[in-house]
Amino acid sequence: MELRQLRYFMEVAEREHVSEAADHLHVAQSAISRQIANLEEELNVTLFEREGRNIKLTPIGKEFLIHVKTAMKAIDYAKEQIDEYLDPHRGTVKIGFPTSLASQLLPTVISAFKEEYPHVEFLLRQGSYKFLIEAVRNRDIDLALLGPVPTNFSDITGKILFTEKIYALVPLNHPLAKQKTVHLIDLRNDQFVLFPEGFVLREMAIDTCKQAGFAPLVSTEGEDLDAIKGLVSAGMGVTLLPESTFAETTPRFTVKIPIEFPQVKRTVGIIKPKNRELAPSANDFYEFVIQFFSKLEQYQ
């Protein structure tokens, strides 16, 4: 069994067409067909079956694909480790982040890191809270910046970088807009603008409202921070957001108000796999991030 055969197999399985796989891999169609046939002969099973003009995986082919993907991911990771061992200052760091940390925090820390390690490259993946945790566990990314920092996973370790307050964001013409602080219960009759189901910032907002003694009336949803802030600015409702999402400014026609009760904070940090050694460049970045935030007064 050869790596070439496995890569051909994965490409055909994804495209369900030998000629398309051949075009993408820049090899002859006959070469792919021959290698797939050799693989099936070695395994003594049929991996594909024809369905019209396309070919589909057989049940055993689907099972084989799962293991091939896992094996190829491990092999690619091993090659990356060797490359970085030979030159640890020229690696690639694959880091994930949520939308709430995209505008200021991530660019700031990467820019500072690049000053010391100019030849290290970054592959950035934005995703939801649960997606980022699974991506670290599955080796799709090396590290993830996120909040809150998870503490209940046996295969993930996290380091808290800072703790931040949660604020109420209301339209400029809101009755409470001129108050210096707000009790969250005072917003119980307002309509809320939140992220959709499955987003951790939605869960945070709902849990905070429950601590205040009410369930928020969610009238509008937005899938990113700009949408949420824009809807509040347009008078569609109020929302709750962490301090770091404001990036030193408050959106036009809105007011950011500290919540006096309940006083809720969230942790923000960086996570990495617990039982897997990071490549040198990824480990350098992990250690750099921890030191970077320990020196920043604004995050203390």
From Swiss-Prot:
SUPFAM superfamilies: Periplasmic binding protein-like II, Winged helix' DNA-binding domain. Activated by alpha-ketoglutarate and inhibited by glutamate and by RocG. InterPro entries: LysR_subst-bd (IPR005119), Tscrpt_reg_HTH_LysR (IPR000847), WH-like_DNA-bd_sf (IPR036388), WH_DNA-bd_sf (IPR036390). The keyword Chloroplast does not apply. GO terms for biological process: glutamate biosynthetic process; regulation of DNA-templated transcription. PROSITE patterns: HTH_LYSR. PANTHER family: HTH-TYPE TRANSCRIPTIONAL REGULATOR CYNR, TRANSCRIPTIONAL DUAL REGULATOR HCAR-RELATED. This is Transcriptional dual regulator GltC. The gene is gltC.
